């Protein structure tokens, strides 16, 4: 098994920690909130409020299931537009009350169904990008598994973007890339090598700001390590004047 094959397999592993695992394992007294107040609740997206060392934090994430029944409930981690609108509702609420935002991302991409398109999937993603770029509180985004296309980017316009070591982040899946470029989905691993989707490659290209090691950690230790990193970064970001925070975020993405 090649390195890229192993990373993709691990990124998609159903046994990986989910967004809800991180929310409940890192933030004390996490309370999940539901619904976008326009259409319905989307099971593919979780969000709520918890505390980190006594500081209130808004947490949102994209949730995959661990079995078929759970994946059907979670739509295999592919959010509908109401899911993105739920995250925006919670992030604007965080802005109102001065709470920092932490996002956990694990999705192959936004749901591409007809109903999702009719309800404004593209608009929902675009609005998240626009609103997050000017959200007046610190934002940390962490890719914990797959980071696929605009569906992932819709939660990743942040002051700091991190990846777990065995996660991936790309404009589309390697299978989709191979099908488009060569009309042959079986060449997915070859496509993955060209796409530069691994955490260390993206860190080198400055697409992400930090890689959190996984090797040698059990789940409890990984949660503790991520908690420590988040606490330290939020403390640092909270020291910045608002104008500087927003300018740094703008320049972070403008350089691409």
Swiss-Prot record:
Matches recorded under Pfam families: ACCA (PF03255)
Record-level GO BP terms: fatty acid biosynthetic process; malonyl-CoA biosynthetic process
Xref: HAMAP family: AcetylCoA_CT_alpha
First-level EC class: transferase
InterPro entries: Acetyl_CoA_COase_a_su, ClpP/crotonase-like_dom_sf, COA_CT_C
Name by which UniProt lists this protein: Acetyl-coenzyme A carboxylase carboxyl transferase subunit alpha
Organism ancestry: Bacteria, Bacillati, Bacillota, Bacilli, Lactobacillales
Function: Component of the acetyl coenzyme A carboxylase (ACC) complex. First, biotin carboxylase catalyzes the carboxylation of biotin on its carrier protein (BCCP) and then the CO(2) group is transferred by the carboxyltransferase to acetyl-CoA to form malonyl-CoA.
EC numbers: 2.1.3.15
Quaternary assembly: Acetyl-CoA carboxylase is a heterohexamer composed of biotin carboxyl carrier protein (AccB), biotin carboxylase (AccC) and two subunits each of ACCase subunit alpha (AccA) and ACCase subunit beta (AccD).
Domain CoA carboxyltransferase C-terminal residue range list: 1-236
Domain of life, per lineage: Bacteria
């Amino acid at each position: 098994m090649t390195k890229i094959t192993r990373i993709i397999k691990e990124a998609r592993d159903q046994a990986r920690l989910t967004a809800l695992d991180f929310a409940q394992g890192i933030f004390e007294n996490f309370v999940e909130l539901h619904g976008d107040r326009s259409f319905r609740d989307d099971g593919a997206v979780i969000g709520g409020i918890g505390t980190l060392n006594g500081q209130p934090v808004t947490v949102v994430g994209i949730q995959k299931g661990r079995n078929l029944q759970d994946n059907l409930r979670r739509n295999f981690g592919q959010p509908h537009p109401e899911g993105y609108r739920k995250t925006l509702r919670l992030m604007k609420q965080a802005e109102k009350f001065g709470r920092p935002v932490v996002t956990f991302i694990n999705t192959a991409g936004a749901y591409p169904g007809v109903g999702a398109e009719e309800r404004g999937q593209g608009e929902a993603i675009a609005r998240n990008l626009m609103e997050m770029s000017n959200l007046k509180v610190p934002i940390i985004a962490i890719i914990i598994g797959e980071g696929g296309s605009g569906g992932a980017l819709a939660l990743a316009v942040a002051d700091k973007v991190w990846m777990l070591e065995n996660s991936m982040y790309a404009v589309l899946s390697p299978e989709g890339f191979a099908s488009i470029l060569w009309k042959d989905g079986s060449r997915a691993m070859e496509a993955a090598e060209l796409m530069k989707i691994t955490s260390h490659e993206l860190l080198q290209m400055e697409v992400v700001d930090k890689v959190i090691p996984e090797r040698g950690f059990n789940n409890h230790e990984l949660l503790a390590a991520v908690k420590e990193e988040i606490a330290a970064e939020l403390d640092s970001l909270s020291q910045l004047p608002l104008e500087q925070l927003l300018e740094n975020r703008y320049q972070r993405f403008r350089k691409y």
